[in-house]
Each structure stands twice: as structure tokens, then as C-alpha cells.
Amino acid sequence: MDFLKRICLKRISAAGEKTSPGLLRRGVREMVRSYKGPDSRRGDVLILFEMDYAQIASALYGLRRKEMYRDYMEICGSLHTVLQKCAAGTIPAVFAANLYGEACLLAGAFEEALRIFTELEEETRDLDGPDNGFQLRARYGMARARQGLGRYEEALRDLNDILVRRARRLPPDDPRILAGMARAAGAREQMGQDRQAAELYRTLYRKSRRAFGEDHPFTLRCLAGAEKAEE
């Protein structure tokens, strides 16, 4: 695996993209730990997935810098290869589909993102018990896609439902809960509910200041969101 990780990091460097080595390591480690496909396919699936994860992670960071369509097409080709090699219903297949949906969101392909996350939500309902992390992540992707399509009321309903479900399993200041609250505040602002959005941003500001510190970027974004909504 060390040899493959060196290949992954070399590919990222060659692509000239900036990515987080921690993100790569966590993704690869989780993929290796949780793979449950047939033993006969384990070797080639893990090799393909590890190499393609590096390429995908690299391209995703490129998308965030607005280099959208070139990288988006590269991701699609890479993910088709991975998904064909992964046994259906396995953790690697779910992980690859999540990355594909994320790439669609970043590239502005919201209809395709909604399709892939809707399929994922259905496929992962019974994967690890009710309200499992895979299912809630897919629901969150659906909400983001609907928000991108301007379907703010539907997105807000999804986000509020996700927050209730995550609150059953996670501490109140968990970053996933805070991120969901921030997106819900944004949806309210887009719907013209400025007062409710400002209240939510203020609550987020207090939570983030306590959890991350007063000068943390997320804390400052929450404060800026509250001030903007109050204008």
C-alpha cells in the first residue's frame, strides 16, 4: 500500500493541483478498512480505487478553483472505470458514487447530482441501520442539488430533517451539524426569510466560536452571514 500511496501522491503532484494529503489518507484508509466485496476482486479493485481516488481528489480541488469542465469530464471517465470494477452495493462503490455526486455539484450539474444522490439514498437505507451516515450524506447531497436548482423550500425541508436525524447520533457542535445549519441558513436567506436566517447565523456564530475559536474561518463566515441577513 505504501508504494500505491506514493503513486497517488505523485499523480497529484504531476497534475499540478493542490489537495489535502490528510483527505487522501483518510479516504484510502476508510476504503481499505471497509471493503466487503469478493476476495477474488479485492486486489484490482483496491489498486484502481486508490489510484483513481488521488486523481479525483486532485480534480475536485481544481473544480473549487473554477476549473470546471475539463476536470469534470476527467472525473466522469475516471469514476466510470472505478464503478465498473467495484462490486455493486460495496462500500467502494458507494464512496465512488458520493465523489461523483460531489463533482457534479461543484461543476454545477445539479440535475445529475440530484439523480445520483437520490439513487444513493435508496441504495444505502439498509446498509448500516436507520439514519446511517451513508444515507444521511446522500440526503445532504440531494438537498444541496435542490438548492442549486432553486428549489429552496424542498432543500430546506431536507436539511431540517437531516439535522434532526443527525442530532440523534452526533454531539450538538459536530462540524456536520454546523455545516447543515449553515446551509439551512443560506436556504432561508435565498427564500427571503432574512430574520430567520440572521437568527440561525447568530446561533451558528456562538456555536462555532465555542467549538473552533473566534478567528476560525467558519466562525467569521457565520458572523458575516448574520450581518448580511440583518442589512
Where are each of the predicted segments found?
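Intrinsic-disorder-linked linear interaction elements in eukaryotic regulatory proteins
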Residues: M1-E231
